[in-house]
Swiss-Prot record:
Protein family: Belongs to the MoaE family.
InterPro entries assigned: MoaE_sf, Mopterin_biosynth_MoaE
Biological role stated in the UniProt entry: Converts molybdopterin precursor Z into molybdopterin. This requires the incorporation of two sulfur atoms into precursor Z to generate a dithiolene group. The sulfur is provided by MoaD.
Entry keyword set: Molybdenum cofactor biosynthesis, Transferase
Annotated pathway: Cofactor biosynthesis; molybdopterin biosynthesis
Reactions that this protein is recorded to catalyse: 2 [molybdopterin-synthase sulfur-carrier protein]-C-terminal-Gly-aminoethanethioate + cyclic pyranopterin phosphate + H2O = molybdopterin + 2 [molybdopterin-synthase sulfur-carrier protein]-C-terminal Gly-Gly + 2 H(+)
GO MF term set: molybdopterin synthase activity
Protein name in UniProt: Molybdopterin synthase catalytic subunit
Subunit structure comment from the entry: Heterotetramer of 2 MoaD subunits and 2 MoaE subunits. Also stable as homodimer. The enzyme changes between these two forms during catalysis.
Gene3D superfamilies, sorted: Molybdopterin biosynthesis MoaE subunit
One of the GO biological process terms: Mo-molybdopterin cofactor biosynthetic process
Amino acid sequence: MGKSKVSLVKKPEDFNIEEAIALVSSSSTGGIVIFLGKVRDENLGRKVEKLIYEAYDEMAIKEMERIRNEALDRFPIVDALIWHRIGELEVGENTILVVVSAKHRREAFEACAWIVDEVKKRVPVWKREVTDEGEFWIEGDRHVPVKR
């Protein structure tokens, strides 16, 4: 998949978790926390068929790099990695991978949660949800019907 710690991964390619762990590991690593986002089968009472992720690639990569660098400055961690998938993803498929290494688990957990929250808030990746009731753009907690 490449050796970058920040990446947009185009379907059909998926995450290589062992590679991700190796990229953030060092002799000072005491623990690693992994967040792996998945496409679930239900949202707000609607049956989800798939999610379609689109991105402004260059800007998304730059913002993910900023978030990673901010996490390295803000938390006492060893390293961090952010990979986000793009394309049509079926129920059960992986969507985002955040891996954080630290000397101690608490810092790794806190940094990982912060990174996931910041990616959702700041990175120009758009999520379209295809359900049994139609298609919706997901904007935070808002669901906006797709107009055709």
